[in-house]
Amino acid sequence: MSKIPLTIRGAEKLREELHRLKHEDRPRVIQAIAEAREHGDLKENAEYHAAREQQSFIEGRIQEIEGKLSNAQIIDPAAVQAAPKIVFGATVALEDTDTEETVTYQIVGEDEADIKQHLISVNSPIARALIGKEEGDEAVVQAPGGERTYEIVEVRYE
């Protein structure tokens, strides 16, 4: 299995979620299952079945996070020595050549991506178009809404 790139912040968020699942959510669901069992017949006990389903989801998510963390390549963007080239972890300011609108994105791992926070996945069309480019270059992005051209205004690692 190949390594999954994660920023330090992304790995920490996964660790926090894992801790919450193991130490808060899992015990709560186990208690709910025990209480539902006390209500008698399990075949028609909706509370029991709902709690078991939630337990299954929690256990699956725990395994998923543990797998991601064990296969993670944790990268500190501030320590990346790739400048001026754009690589994973870069924060990039772009200007749309049509609208002259400027937007800034950080290229992060798949699990960290959040467009509202300007965090884009390393596998996104924008990131794929940017990787390997430098300040002053133009990047053509094949987006679902059509082709967009951006000028790379600034590249930084923080």
UniProtKB/Swiss-Prot annotation:
Keyword Coiled coil included in the entry's annotation: yes
- Name the Gene3D superfamilies on file: Transcription elongation factor, GreA/GreB, C-terminal domain, Transcription elongation factor, GreA/GreB, N-terminal domain
InterPro entries registered for this protein in UniProt: GreA/GreB_C_sf, TF_GreA/GreB_CS, Tscrpt_elong_fac_GreA, Tscrpt_elong_fac_GreA/B, Tscrpt_elong_fac_GreA/B_C, Tscrpt_elong_fac_GreA/B_fam, Tscrpt_elong_fac_GreA/B_N, Tscrpt_elong_fac_GreA/B_N_sf
Cleavable signal peptide: none
Give start-end ranges for the coiled-coil region(s): 53-73
UniProt KW keywords: Coiled coil, DNA-binding, Transcription, Transcription regulation
One record GO biological process: regulation of DNA-templated transcription elongation
Superkingdom, taxonomy of origin: Bacteria
Which SUPFAM superfamilies does this entry report, sorted A to Z? FKBP-like, GreA transcript cleavage protein, N-terminal domain
Task: Spell out the molecular function terms from Gene Ontology.
Answer: DNA binding; RNA polymerase binding
Cross-referenced HAMAP family? GreA_GreB
Q: Which family does it belong to?
A: Belongs to the GreA/GreB family.
Role of this protein: Necessary for efficient RNA polymerase transcription elongation past template-encoded arresting sites. The arresting sites in DNA have the property of trapping a certain fraction of elongating RNA polymerases that pass through, resulting in locked ternary complexes. Cleavage of the nascent transcript by cleavage factors such as GreA or GreB allows the resumption of elongation from the new 3'terminus. GreA releases sequences of 2 to 3 nucleotides.
Its protein name is: Transcription elongation factor GreA
Please tell me the species this chain comes from.
Halorhodospira halophila (strain DSM 244 / SL1) (Ectothiorhodospira halophila (strain DSM 244 / SL1))
